[in-house]
A protein has these predicted regions:
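Conserved catalytic or regulatory cores that recognize and/or transform ribose-phosphate-containing ligands
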Residues: 1-101
Length: 101
């Protein structure tokens, strides 16, 4: 299972980017957790950033790897997801690197 980490808060097109990444991974046979879909089931306007990150950490723990989307370095949330995944000994790599193989 692969978790997708990428900028959300400051990117109005984040849903399209996450969806495209998820589709590419699924076409290669991977099971994917797309956190951009959480907005469909979690009332984000009623949750703090910390509460959302708490949920994402639990989802990350269900995965074997985390892939990053371009621009993740500028997102504090992504930085925290990557650090958490590395601390949990998950494979962490840019999506481009995974898709090259």
């Amino acid at each position: 299972m692969i978790y997708i980490s990428g900028p959300i808060s400051k990117d109005p097109n984040y849903r399209l980017k996450f969806r495209a990444a998820a589709e590419q991974l699924k076409l290669r046979g991977y099971n994917v957790i797309n956190p951009a879909e959480l907005a469909d089931v979690l009332p984000a306007e009623h949750l703090s950033h910390e509460e959302i990150l708490f949920t994402c950490k639990h989802l990350i723990l269900q995965c074997d790897a985390l892939v990053t989307l371009p621009g993740w370095e500028q997102s504090l949330g992504c930085q925290r997801e990557v650090g958490f995944a590395e601390g949990a000994d998950l494979i962490v790599l840019p999506i481009e690197e995974l898709l090259q193989n």
